[in-house]
Structure formats: structure tokens, C-alpha cells
Amino acid sequence: MRKTSSVNYRNEVELLSNCPLAAAPKLIGGRWRIMLLWYVHHGIVRFSDLQKTIPPITEKMLHQQLREMERDILVLRVVQGRTVSYALTELGESLVPMLAGLAEWSERHRVGERLWTALTPLDQPDATADRLEVRGQV
């Protein structure tokens, strides 16, 4: 349980109350949520298909993320017999244009490549020159 008397808590409440740009990442942020929203937006998706599509995510984490997204009214859990599937809610669907724009921006500016390069250890000879070039520190 978080201390509601802390300065950090009060600052967060103030920021989330007054800045829409601060609130949105709290709802869709994290390592997996945007990716899950993107895969689910194509239609009703089975849990097992999500597991296969995103191999690095553990079953436990996938369950947790989907439950939280269901709680936040971003996805709808559909149970048919033993099959569990997920679909976007109206709120989740309203995020799709923003996600598409974000994906386009990321591709245009090669953001994934820049982040990957930044994460590459400097002791790898092949990566050193590229890393310095991307950062503009040649």
C-alpha cells in the first residue's frame, strides 16, 4: 500500500489530474501493454496466440498484463468453453490511431535501432562504431 501522505504521491496525483500527457502513459505504459494492444486490435485473439506472438513474455506476465488491461477497460476477456480470447473495448479501439501514428513515427526515425544501439555493450567491436555514429559522437 502506498503512503498517500508522501510528497511523491501528492505530486503524482497533481500531475495526473492536470496533465493528460502524464496520465496516458500510466494507462498504456510498461514493457508489454502497447504491444498487446497492437496485436489485439486486429480482432479477437486467443491467449495462446498472444503467447506465441510475443515469445519473451512469460505466461504469468501475460495473464497479469491482460487482467490489468481488462481492469482498465482496454480489453474484454471472452470465454468460450475452454478457450479464452481477448478483444479491444471501445476505449482500447480509440487508442489504435495513436498506436499506428506512434509506430509510423518510430519507424521513420529508426527509434528501435537507436535504442538497440544504445543498449549494445561498448566492448563489442562491431557495435562501437555504430553506437558512436548514432549518438553523433564520432
Description of each model-found segment:
Residues 2-8, 16, 38, 94-138:
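Amphipathic alpha-helical dimerization/coiled-coil segments
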Residues 53, 68-70:
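C-terminal flanking helix
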Residues 65:
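Residues within the DNA-recognition helix of helix-turn-helix
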